[in-house]
Curated annotation (Swiss-Prot):
Protein family per UniProt: Belongs to the peptidase M24B family.
Sites where the protein binds Mn(2+) 1: 409, 507, 521
Transmembrane segments: none
Binding site for Mn(2+) 2: 398, 409, 521
Lineage: Eukaryota, Fungi, Dikarya, Ascomycota, Pezizomycotina
Protein name, as recorded: Probable Xaa-Pro aminopeptidase P
């Protein structure tokens, strides 16, 4: 791994801070669209800090610099007891009237508001929007260019719903909220709304854009050079105007002026609660804007039947690729005695996936991790800086792919030698939690917050736990992490009940630092189920699993499983066999591995 000396960069940034009369400068991880994954041109926090982790925020003063990140990284444990958040640390530094600055296009309006409150409380002077991004100025000509990848139309056979219908549904929501319009800033929401896909951000089939939808108009803001004639015709046919990406802020200022009349004052514009501070300011601030949970995000999270069928189909193909990979990997390590590192193994898995129908690319960096590396939740092996896979240790593989008909995310933990009793016990407790969530039946209106304990209960009985959520929403040929639903202890997961059509992960785990890690992840879909009674006349819901990859037989301690759990496991494995066996005709190695792993308990 390349070592980055950030001393000169920080010195240059501090010079610019002085010129702009800023004492403290905030460098978030996000781009202008609050994206989880970002393009290289937006990796400002990594550039200034040298830290390439998946989440965090850099705070730079004239004589100090701090980096806060989530507790999936052990080097800095924001979110743990007695460790301040970046907002708290920045506010502490702002005492005695100091000024805090930030690029207002890359911080959300709620985050900016919370930061200002903390700064004022600690005696700071103000939070100011610095017009030019100071890190970009330090980066200069070496900053990567903004991607200009082509945008493509997603066929109706994959989307399941046309753009006109989606716009009609959105306008009904605007009418309910008595709103003048919705300014859309989340890239996956724009891609979904207009049935378009791109590749501007690694692993996410999205493209840089904004959108504006009013009762009488719809406008897509995008670099028009990225649009083919097919895209232009597609948008025009659906009543969507095209404007250049750079015009969004000037255009929303004009839209804001339309609210100056007495008749319009009660009809605010809506923005997502993750929209940037800059966007909200351009629209006129609180007087003219309401921050809401995005109605597009809500609609997108409930898949239509075409999308659900696509998820079923792509998970069968993806499962076949994973089964072939695990059989191949075991043979290479155990029989051929090949020394293989984590990256080479991950590359082989990508190669096998790429042969599957409708394959587009990966949905995130493959976590191919052996031994102690498996205990690092967001571990990312790098060429030249990864481990040789140890056949005598636990191997955890968390991976996924993008297909035209869906998005996959599967984790399996395997052992190619003789696991310890603790490894088997931990694996089986995690498996029991995975099964408990899969078979859960619950009344309509139940949130993922309420279900989280089902997956943890068997670990809790032993005084064990894991420091991550149990489930995240999954897009349909879109982002692998999709809101607003989730299963976990975060209070936000109590705000949105699960609904039929939701697609979500089921991924309990257990990790022993420096030793091993266990995680089992299936993708499950919410559906209505029949129950003998319906208390309160409420429908009851359950799950349908679509992941088709067997569990590791060697790691299962059968004595810890109930008869019901064994029956469920045998039925699941039989289902996998029936749906994937035709992929392995003539492939004795893979078929032999599969038959061994699914042998009934």
């Amino acid at each position: 791994m390349e070592t980055i000396n950030t001393t000169e960069r920080l010195a240059a940034l501090r010079d610019l801070m002085k010129k702009n009369k800023v004492d403290i400068y905030i460098v978030p991880s996000e781009d202008s669209h609050s994206s989880e994954y970002i393009a290289a041109c937006d990796a400002r926090r990594e550039f200034i800090s040298g830290f390439s982790g998946s989440a965090g925020c850099a705070v730079v003063t004239l004589d100090k610099a701090a980096l806060a990140t989530d507790d999936n990284w052990l080097l800095l444990k924001q979110g743990l007891q007695d460790v301040p958040t970046w907002q708290e640390w920045a506010a502490e530094q702002s005492e005695s009237g100091k000024v805090v600055g930030v690029d207002s296009t890359i911080i959300s309006a709620p985050d900016a508001r919370k930061l200002l409150e903390k700064v004022k409380k600690r005696g700071g002077s103000d939070l100011v929007a610095v017009e030019e991004n100071l890190v970009d100025l330090v980066w200069g000509d070496n900053r990567p260019s903004r991607p200009k990848e082509p945008v493509k139309v997603l066929a109706r056979g994959f989307s399941g719903k046309d753009v006109k219908t989606k716009l009609e549904d959105l306008r009904k929501e605007l009418q309910k909220k008595k709103s003048s319009g919705f300014i859309v800033s989340m890239l996956d929401e724009i891609a979904w709304l207009f049935n378009l896909r791109g590749s501007d951000i690694p692993y996410n089939p999205v493209f840089f854009s904004y959108a504006s939808v009013t009762p009488s108009s719809a406008t897509l803001y995008v670099d028009s050079s990225k649009l083919s004639e097919e895209c232009i015709t597609h948008l025009n046919d659906n009543g969507v105007s095209i404007r250049e990406y750079s015009k969004i802020f000037s255009d929303v200022e004009v839209l804001s002026q339309s609210l100056d009349s007495e008749d319009a004052k009660l009809k605010k514009f809506l923005v997502s609660s993750r929209a940037s501070w800059a966007l909200k300011r351009a629209l006129g601030g609180d007087a003219k804007v309401d921050e809401v949970r995005s109605p597009i995000g809500d609609a997108k999270s409930i898949k239509n039947e075409t999308e659900l069928e696509g998820m079923r189909a792509c998970h069968i193909r993806d499962g076949a690729a994973l089964i072939e990979y695990f059989a191949w990997l075991e043979h290479q390590l155990v029989v051929e005695k090949v020394e293989m590192d984590e990256v080479i193994a991950a590359d082989k898995l990508e190669q096998l996936r790429s042969k599957q129908k409708h394959f587009v690319g990966l949905s995130f960096d493959t976590i191919s991790s052996t031994g102690a590396n498996a205990a690092v939740i967001h571990y990312k092996p790098e060429p030249g800086n990864c481990s040789i896979i140890d056949p005598k240790a636990v191997y955890l593989c968390d991976s996924g792919a993008q297909y035209f008909d869906g998005t996959t995310d599967t984790t399996r933990t395997l052992h190619f030698g003789e696991p310890t009793e603790m490894e088997k016990k931990a694996y089986t407790l995690v498996l029991k939690g995975n099964i408990a969530l899969d078979v859960a039946v619950f009344p309509k209106g139940t949130s993922g917050f309420a279900l989280d304990a089902l997956a943890r209960q068997f670990l809790w009985e032993e005084g064990l736990d894991y420091r991550h959520g149990t489930g995240h929403g999954v897009g349909s040929y879109l982002n692998v992490h999709e809101g607003p639903i989730g299963i976990g202890t975060r209070i936000q997961y109590s705000e949105v009940p699960l609904a039929p059509g939701n697609v979500i992960s089921n991924e309990p785990g257990y990790y022993e630092d420096g030793s091993f890690g266990i995680r089992i992840e299936n993708i499950i879909m919410v559906k209505e189920v029949e129950t003998k009674h319906q208390f309160g006349d409420k429908p009851y819901l359950g799950f349908e699993h679509v992941t088709m990859v067997p569990y590791c037989r060697k790691l299962i301690d059968e004595t810890l499983l109930t008869r019901r759990e064994k029956h469920w496991l045998n039925e699941y494995h039989a289902d996998i066999y029936s749906k994937t066996k035709d992929f392995f005709k003539g492939d004795e190695l893979t078929m032999s591995w599969l038959e061994r792993e699914i042998e009934p308990l």
